[in-house]
Amino acid sequence: MRRLVIRSLLPAVAIALAFVLGTTPAYAYPPDPPSVSTSQTYLNALTVRAEGSTDGYSRDLFPHWHIVSGNCDTRETVLKRDGTNVVTDSACHATSGRWYSVYDSVWLTDSSGVDIDHIVPLAEAWKSGADKWTTSRREQFANDLDRAQLIAVSASSNRSKGDKDPSLWKPPNTNEYCMYARDWIWVKYY
């Protein structure tokens, strides 16, 4: 995803990179993004060009929530990774636990109120070049647990974000701007 479009992202990222958080969160989080300096290097390496269209886009073209381990799919794996005291049933569905939505600073105790957000939305990836990827590569992108592409957040914050990029949406929790920008750059650099 290294050569994909970054539409109006540079100003937002430059501002976000100026706010480096010095504390470690007291909740689970996806894999740590690269450092601020590495993120800046990645950002400088990205190609900026006109964004494509959503013609032909469908979420179904990004097979997601595949089985990761046993009978746990990607969604369930992220719920366990990002939650605390998560208990699952025999089908790997979360029956209890707590999830902190960093986007809007909300604690959730019912997994049905938790969405798994794609940091770089699938439709945005499509407009940035994923329309030319193989189905296998789109599946890997939609289920990526190696980078901070997937994060458990409140359903309301995820729906507010929708398919928007950082020029149109940032987390309501302004303390999250820097981490969000670094996550976005890391996924885009891939």
Across the structure, where does each feature detected by a protein language model lie?
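Secretory targeting and sorting signals
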Residues: 1-29
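N-terminal module-boundary/linker segments of secreted carbohydrate-active enzymes
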Residues: 20, 25-69
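Exposed alpha-helical structural elements
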Residues: 38-44, 74-78, 183
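A general structural signal for short secondary-structure junctions and capping/turn motifs
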Residues: 47, 68-70, 91, 141-145
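N-terminal carbohydrate-binding/catalytic regions of secreted carbohydrate-active enzymes
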Residues: 55-96
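Domain-level detector of nuclease and nuclease-like folds
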Residues: 99-190
